[in-house]
Amino acid sequence: MTGPLVTLEVHDTLLAARRAGEAALECSLDLGRSTTTVEAGEDAWTWQGQRYPYLETCKGRTIYYWTGAQFEPVARFSGSLIKLVPTGWGPPTFEIDGIKMLPTSQVSPYEDARHKVALIQPRGKVVLDTCGGLGYFAAWCLEGRAARVLSWEKSADVLWLRSLNPWSPPPDEALSLVHGDVVEGIGTLPDGSVDAALHDPPRFGIAGELYSLTFYQELARVLRRKGRLFHYTGSPNALTSGRDVPREVARRLREAGFDVEPSGDGVLAIRR
């Protein structure tokens, strides 16, 4: 993170300190990763020797970042509105056209990723992370001592969100992050070169190719025998959507060479 991140909760805390005449206060400017000391002045607040203005308008469900000249929402519009969204848990989620891409109601999106990564037992493994998103899968793979994580992310806008999110791990020797389409990128991986995989694609209506038998066959090709794959499917309503996506996913994975069992809001598949 290169500057402070401000949410409505943080901004209200700053304003309350100003009203109370408090010279200094403790708050978080990195979405709950840490706390820091801020001086609340009458016209501006000061952090690490730099003065920042109070926002004229600070909206809920919005994160503001410092551009070097002013605060702007962590959001972009390029065909769709994509934005980083604060949660009560600390680690943010993100939305595309108002649709949440990560769970937040019952559990932190970061903690949710930990549970799913545990299913593939990453320790010592080369892990394929097909749809990197904010990098929470990758973060827990690294925490779980994966030997290496190979991550793809197709959206430049998501990568931009990720660059501003203090909960997203930066690329390094253990984390390869490719800006590209994994449908094409997976073809560059040798047979049996991956020990485990995590597949968290956008919903079927947006990225049907990531649910195809052809792609699952590629996953089977790059995974070693007995390699584990967690495939997030969510729990779409078959009555309203007209299709049972989890059942379709399980059927195609079996056809591609996996043994499959339901696991929470996805399926756990083992390469035969």
PLM-predicted stretches and their roles:
Residues 152-191:
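S-adenosyl-L-methionine
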Residues 235-272:
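Class I S-adenosyl-L-methionine
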Residues 226-234:
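Conserved beta-strand signature within the Rossmann-like core of class I S-adenosyl-L-methionine
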Residues 123-134:
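Conserved class I S-adenosyl-L-methionine
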Residues 1-88:
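N-terminal auxiliary segments of SAM/dcSAM-dependent transferases
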Residues 134-146:
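Conserved SAM-binding loop of SAM-dependent methyltransferases across substrates and taxa
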Residues 107-125:
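Conserved alpha-helix/loop element of class I SAM-dependent methyltransferases that forms part
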Residues 211-225:
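A short glycine-rich, Lys/Arg-flanked "PGG" loop and its adjoining helix->strand segment in the class I
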